[in-house]
């Protein structure tokens, strides 16, 4: 069923905005798509987003605090999947968009997970947690929406225990020419039209396409993780490389990986 749309909004390209403008734009965009966010994620990815999250959670190791920090949690899908696979853990979900947090809380209440998952408002670039308090810090499809990615990576590294993991799941614009042409057509032509049938702010999905196309290639992002102080950095292509799973480890205080 189509929804009533608001007046068509336009957003500047990611590469042409300041960090402050980027943060404000992200809050505005995601505040307008919360009610249909889960449906559109599943629909537009042909439900591959569910499989990708499962793959990310399978790589998580909980050995000390038994706690996961889900950064840019959105409506909490990564947090919920983590609890499904690791019933012994507790999850803290953090997001900068109040409307997303509200939807996330409703979801976990319906699933009777309020005692296992908590949500709070917060900025990934200034995490409100002490050092060394989570086994894993993860973020699914959110790192590209953060203006200062190196700072967010440093913060995620800071709050995990020595030997803990930073796990990133993010979309990728393929480099293979033929696949790139098809994906460009999908992102810039097909996706906005499909989203427009269901979203009251279809322009948000133009931003989605733009943010994917301007995200660093896997080799560059993996290097960014190393520069943030993470070790044993891995990058794994999923579904022909349209999504990548990145894993990094916080070294111990002697600089060694546990």
Predicted regions and their residues:
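A short glycine-rich, Lys/Arg-flanked "PGG" loop and its adjoining helix->strand segment in the class I
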Residues: 150-162
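C-terminal alpha-helical "lid/dimerization" subdomain adjacent to the S-adenosyl-L-methionine
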Residues: 24, 169-228, 234
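A short acidic, Gly/Pro-enriched loop at the edge of an enzyme's catalytic core
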Residues: 125-136
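N-terminal auxiliary segments of SAM/dcSAM-dependent transferases
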Residues: 2-28
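Hydrophobic beta-strand segment of the Class I
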Residues: 37, 137-138
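Class I SAM-dependent methyltransferase SAM/SAH-binding core
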Residues: 67-126
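Conserved alpha-helix/loop element of class I SAM-dependent methyltransferases that forms part
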Residues: 36-39, 46-66, 81
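Core SAM-dependent methyltransferase catalytic element
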Residues: 229-258
């Amino acid at each position: 069923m189509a929804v009533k749309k608001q007046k068509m909004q336009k957003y500047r390209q990611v590469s042409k905005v300041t960090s402050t403008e980027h943060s404000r734009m992200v809050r505005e965009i995601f505040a307008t798509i919360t009610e249909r966010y889960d449906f559109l994620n599943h629909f537009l990815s042909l439900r591959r987003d569910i499989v990708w999250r499962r793959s990310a959670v399978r790589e998580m190791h909980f050995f000390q605090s038994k706690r996961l920090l889900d950064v840019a949690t959105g409506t909490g899908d990564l947090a919920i999947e983590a609890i499904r696979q690791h019933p012994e853990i507790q999850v803290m979900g953090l997001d900068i968009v109040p409307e997303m947090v509200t939807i996330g809380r409703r979801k976990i209440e319906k699933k009777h997970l309020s005692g296992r998952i908590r949500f709070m408002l917060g900025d990934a670039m200034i995490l409100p947690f002490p050092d060394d308090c989570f086994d894993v810090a993860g973020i699914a499809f959110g790192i590209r929406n953060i203006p200062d990615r190196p700072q967010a990576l440093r913060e995620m590294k800071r709050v995990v225990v020595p030997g803990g993991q930073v796990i990133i799941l993010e979309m990728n614009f393929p480099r293979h020419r033929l696949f790139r042409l098809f994906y460009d057509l999908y992102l810039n032509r097909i996706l906005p039209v499909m989203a427009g049938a269901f979203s009251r702010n279809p322009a948000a999905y133009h931003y989605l396409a733009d943010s994917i196309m301007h995200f660093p290639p896997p080799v560059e992002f993996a290097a960014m993780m190393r520069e943030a102080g993470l070790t044993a950095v891995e990058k794994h292509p999923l579904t022909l490389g349209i999504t990548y799973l990145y894993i990094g480890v916080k070294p111990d205080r002697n600089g060694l990986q546990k």
